[in-house]
A protein has these predicted regions:
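Metzincin-family zinc-dependent endopeptidase catalytic domain
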Residues: 78-183
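Divalent metal-coordination and catalytic microenvironments
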Residues: 66, 89, 169-172, 190, ...
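Bacterial N-terminal signal peptides
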Residues: 9-18
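Bacterial N-terminal signal peptides that target proteins for export
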Residues: 1-8
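Disordered inhibitory propeptide/activation segment of secreted metzincin zinc metalloprotease zymogens
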Residues: 21-77, 216-236
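Metalloprotease/metallohydrolase-associated module, dominated by Zn2+-dependent proteases
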Residues: 24, 139-154, 161-162, 178-236
Length: 236
């Protein structure tokens, strides 16, 4: 069984004081009208909206870029897993928002800094975390994912499939999604129930919550932080 717990700071946000600005936009249409794809349901009850707790933790543009910076020891299989996770989010956004919200992999490009940067450091985190998204003022330059556990635990490194799942989860944080409110039992991608209770599910609620996060873009208005969460998955 793999050991993974995401950033502890994001767990604390479940009960933190909300810093959402008054007058934040809400969707003028139901999320299922704004989203143009059909994804599986999950057992998530609601999703925390991170900008409610971290001012500036939202995007003021929708043409997002992402890049990978990997440790020299990274294997091809590990790099492929991270790349596949990015491609999954990229294609999901394209399918679900019709090009309105995009995520482009610019790994290796020197033209400009990416909005989101995934750092793969095999031994980072010790026993504390398997992935961590440190985001802030309209940017997320520090997603950290790892594969190797400390030797004292006497466990094999996490396999590439699991590394890909962690990367998917952390990119979800970078886009603005917090954890599920039923955190420990949920197998939604943004929960902690996987893999013990089943494979993670990139769900209908995840993309509907992103429609909530990017309400300003969907409504065609000026950029503004999301409304008050958590996003209730029963609304989709």
């Amino acid at each position: 069984m793999s050991v993974y717990r995401g950033a502890l700071a994001l767990l604390v946000c479940l009960f933190a004081f909300s810093a959402t600005a008054l007058g934040a936009p809400t969707l003028k249409k139901a999320p299922n009208d704004a989203v143009t794809c059909t994804l599986p349901d999950s057992n998530a009850e609601a999703l925390v909206i991170l900008s409610n707790f971290y001012p500036g933790y939202w995007w003021d543009h929708t043409d997002l870029t992402i890049a990978v910076q990997a440790h020299p020891s990274a294997t091809d299989e590990q790099l492929d897993a991270i790349s596949d996770a990015i491609a999954t989010w990229s294609s999901t956004l394209e399918d679900c928002f019709g090009g309105l919200i995009t995520l482009t992999d610019v790994t290796g490009s020197k033209r400009q800094a990416a909005d989101i940067v995934v750092h793969f450091v095999p031994t980072a985190g010790g026993v504390v975390f398997g992935g961590y998204a440190l985001c802030g003022d309209h940017g997320c330059p520090n997603i950290l994912v790892r594969s190797d556990l400390p030797p004292s635990l006497d466990r094999e490194p996490n396999d590439p499939e699991y590394l890909g799942w962690v990367t998917l989860h952390e990119i979800g944080h970078a886009l603005g999604l917090g954890h599920t409110t039923n955190l420990l039992e949920s197998t939604d991608l943004m929960g902690y129930g996987w893999p013990d209770l089943g494979d993670p599910v990139l769900s209908d609620c995840d993309v509907d919550a992103l429609a909530f996060v990017f309400a300003w873009a969907i409504n065609g208005t000026e950029p503004a932080p999301p409304g008050e969460g958590p996003y209730d998955c029963s609304l989709d």
